[in-house]
Amino acid sequence: QENLILFGEKGQFVLRGNDLLTPKTVSVTPITNYDNDTGTTPLELGSYIYFPFNRGSFSGLREFTINANTDNYDSVEVTSHVPRYIPSDIIDIAGSTSENMICLVSASNTREMFVYKYYWEGNQKILSSWSKFTFPFNIRGMEFVDSDLYVVAVKSSKTELLKIPMEEKLVDDNTTFNTYLDMRTNNTYTTGNDGTITLPFTPEAG
């Protein structure tokens, strides 16, 4: 559909693309009336749009759907089974259709990232789960590129760009397993040298 979906604090609207668009004919139509946390931009993922909302001191997430055949719009909450799990005031949201995953960060604790994982079978979502990652740094931004999540991290006044592979059943090259080690880097060792390895970052004590 060539429609523009607009999100307000108290509702959702549509600007239809098949109408003649002039200053005199433009028409914005309300379609649903769900609260929206305007602290972050809604996430377009596949044929759905995800947007957070505040529930007191906690946050919820809605899955906005469009029926192209009937031009009907609806929204389903995907946090109804965990209403007191995610803190309020979401400031960033990122998602991947490759991994069926959405990540959220709240302003109340930018060291935590909440992860929504789901599985579709046809048009039916048969599995979904929420989990939480806790990091030793503050998250300032994040974005998926294919199956990798890139995170802008701040720790001890230093800003770093980190990559977190989110691919399922990921294994290391030339192995049948994956090594779970933060900040790891590849290095080629030559027999006979002093064994010094130069890291692309400055290690911290502890």
Regions found by a protein language model. Give the residues of each.
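Surface-exposed extracellular loop regions of Gram-negative outer-membrane beta-barrel proteins
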Residues: 5-20
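Beta-sheet repeat architectures centered on beta-propellers
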Residues: 2, 55-206
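Catalytic or ion-translocation cores adjacent to nucleophile or general acid/base/metal-coordination motifs
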Residues: 19-63
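Short, charged/polar micro-motifs that form catalytic or ligand-binding hotspots
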Residues: 2-3, 32
